[in-house]
Amino acid sequence: MDSKKGRPKAAAGKWQTLHPGPKTRAAAGKPGENRPPQRKAGWQAREPASAESPQAPTGPAEDRAARAIQGAFRQLRARRELARRREERREYLEQMETPQKEAYLAPVRREQEAARRLREQEEAAQRERREELQRRRRLLDAAFDGDVGEIRAVLKEVEQLLTREGVGHDEAGEARRLQRRVALAECEDSYGNTPLSEAAAGGQPLAIQLRAELGASPNSKGAFGPTPLYRAAFGGHLAAVEVLLKLGADPRVYAEDGSTPERVASLDTVVSVLRSWDLSLTEAMLQNMEAEQQRRAQEAQRHKEAEAERCGSMTLKVQQLTREQQQCHKELQQAYCELSRRISEHDQCEWRCMDKTKLTLQAIKDTEAQVDRLRQEAQKAEEALAMARLELREQTQEGEEEAPGLKCQVTELHDVLMKDVGNRIRADGRWPLVIDPLGQAATFLRYQDTNYVDTVNPEPLRPETMWLALLGALRYGKPLVFDLREEDLFPVVQRQLEAVQERYLSLLRPTDGPEYSPTQFQEQRLEHFRLFFVTKVQWPPAEQLQVLLPVRVQLPGTGL
């Protein structure tokens, strides 16, 4: 067996010795067996040839060099591509951030400007009140001291002030100047004493005569009922008593304690003058004063009728400006809706990685420019309307209109709206319309536990979204807030809400979850449901003020 096995083995060895070439080829054909020795023999066979004639490396060295070059080139391309994409992202963020900053800063600047104007108006009103009080004190002191020059100086200041206010010297201007002089002559101190009464108490006949010429009444009463004649007789000023009697002072007028000027007179000469005075002269003077008062009343009535005629054209102007303002707000509302659609299209293109982002971004820029232009036009229209209303109020001489509804500050909104302290809202029966030109009320309500709906964005005004907001507010007993901003969007919201005529349980659908089952609508939570409307328009349309309860937000420390 061993010899048989040995013969093939020896034969194989002999075959390998006689034919070494096939063995090498056979060994090379077997994968993984003798390849490394063959590679080593190959390099050893090439070494003498390399030493004799140097050549470029071939085979695996070329592959490694090619891979290194390709790797370096790809890294370079990747770095450049990364830098390009970073630059594009930076430019995109800058392009998106700049409009966002401007959109955020624009209302802030408007709020600051509105607050500055309100503050300046309040400061001007306070300054005018202080100056008026100072003039009154100067007038009262000058009347008591008999300083006629100071009295004339105060009257001259008032005339100059009326001139600066634009009051002319025509019939209407003279009527207004006369009314101002009479009001200044009848001004009172904290005790109800007029300048004429102070002049009588000081015994100043010239000052008494001057005040009477300006229209002051010689029979005015101060605290506890003393007349100027009473005070002059009590002080023993004979000349002042005589002048007052000639001007129509009635010696029969009693004070609150029942005493007459004759009883409190401190000098016998004053008593004798009062006793010997002819009362028929007093009656004649009283009739003349009554006739003068009637004449002034008739002049005031004629002046009022003339003002009403002039206000007719101004009323038409206010109506025209109101229509223009409503048209501007309507166009601005449409522009806001278009901007929201453009932003939604841009977001969808980015999410789907489409190559139309540049087009959508340019469309957003164009729409934002249109919104800014329409916003400025609406602001100008609102300012023109406010000035026309102010001019109309000044012409009718009605002063500042008494704004209907409630007034509160931002810090009091929780008590007024959420708690309804005093049951003012419940007693009125209307839902509140919060009027806040600065927008602080909207920020306050947004961060409360409320369902906040931004009416400028058309998405929340869809029936499905509004239905969920209303149902959620009823289910969890939360206020539902509609922010109208600067636009007149109340009719749009009203149409959406009036479309829901059923009761809240009829709003439920089979697809709703268990949290909206009928058993979850508890009466205790439903009592906390509120409906609020917030607007930045200072003077909303009359229709809104009739349907809703106005709640005006004032600045801290002011009456505005």
Curated annotation (Swiss-Prot):
Domain IQ as annotated: residue spans: 62-91
Domain of life: Eukaryota
Coiled-coil annotated residue ranges, if any: 281-398
This protein's record includes keyword Repeat: yes
Sequence ranges of the ANK repeats: 191-223, 224-253
Record flagged with keyword Repeat: yes
Region feature (Disordered): 1-72
Cystine crosslinks: none
Pfam families xrefs: Ank
Keywords, sorted A to Z: ANK repeat, Coiled coil, Repeat
Leader sequence segment: none
Name by which UniProt lists this protein: IQ motif and ankyrin repeat domain-containing protein 1
Gene it is expressed from: IQANK1
